[in-house]
Amino acid sequence: MTTPLLLRAARGESVERPPIWLMRQAGRYMKVYRDLRDRYPSFRQRSEIPELAIEISLQPFRAFAPDGVILFSDILTPLPGIGIPFDIVESKGPIIDPPIRTLEQVQHLHPLEPEAACPFIRPILATLRQEVGDRAAVLGFAGAPWTLAAYAIEGKSSKDYIQIKTMAYREPDLLHKFLNHLATAIADYLCYQIDCGAQVVQLFDSWAGQLSRQDYDTFAFPYQKQVIQQVKAVYPDVPIILYINGSAAIVDRMAATGVDIVSLDWTVDLGTIRQQFPPSVGLQGNLDPVILFAPQPVLKERSLAIIEAGRKGKYIFNLGHGVLQGTPEENVAFLFDWVKSLA
């Protein structure tokens, strides 16, 4: 069996073309997903019943043959396993009630035992490996400590992050205690995913871009690094990708976490970053997801410019964020075909 293209690229091997997969490549923009969602309206059902999660993960693989197939799940999935229940409400997003705001709550959290807390992960990843074979790499993922803490402390999605930032400034020791607990749990969860079959893993710190550089270095960076070091201690050869939305002010720090690949949002010039980073650090990204609504010649022109900058080193083509609801499926198909034609 040959090694999948994306895995070879992530390791820094010479490849015939840039591999391509898209964040949120499975989801609401696809009619087959919407049809399945109508039958199974609970997100927790769709992501935690193996047959459903496998089907959803494979929908874009069947439609577009991406070079990476990512586990259909949510960054909050491991939280109940440490004692933080959550629900996902359609059109509202995640709800955590009660939110985590006291020392007593943090002290009552327990270590994550992934096999017991998330038993559905093993059959999902094992089946995905079986289904895609060497035609694509199977990716796992997790939320980073700051982002998971933001959800848990705010109790829901937020635009201003008043609760977690107030804790950072008023009770930093409490927040550090919580972040440390999360970092250990996330590292254990990623190691479990790798044990179950994930060949590459991505760490999403979606809300770390909301921090000043000083606060990033205090509350996000050390815990990203802790997760990465703990995973690398067990699986040194498994590539790890780090994604932060809104990373322009801190992108240089991302490389210092020890990740193999930095995933960039679309506000960052990929060519400039390529020149600044050492060759050992790969790049992923970073097409603006809204360009998928543009005419196909524009899509072709913009993606080519990014690829030309990226392919001068270790590189994976992706968007700068997830595929948006309402994105034309035919443009997603065009993008995959176009990038794969560059061999």
From Swiss-Prot:
GO terms for molecular function: uroporphyrinogen decarboxylase activity. Catalyzes the decarboxylation of four acetate groups of uroporphyrinogen-III to yield coproporphyrinogen-III. It is an enzyme of class 4 (lyase). The lineage of its organism: Bacteria, Bacillati, Cyanobacteriota, Cyanophyceae, Acaryochloridales. This is Uroporphyrinogen decarboxylase. Gene3D superfamilies: 3.20.20.210. Pathway: Porphyrin-containing compound metabolism; protoporphyrin-IX biosynthesis; coproporphyrinogen-III from 5-aminolevulinate: step 4/4. InterPro entries: UROD/MetE-like_sf, Uroporphyrinogen_deCO2ase_HemE, Uroporphyrinogen_deCOase. Its main location: cytoplasm. Homodimer. Keywords: Cytoplasm, Decarboxylase, Lyase, Porphyrin biosynthesis. The gene is hemE. It catalyses: uroporphyrinogen III + 4 H(+) = coproporphyrinogen III + 4 CO2. It is found in: Cytoplasm.
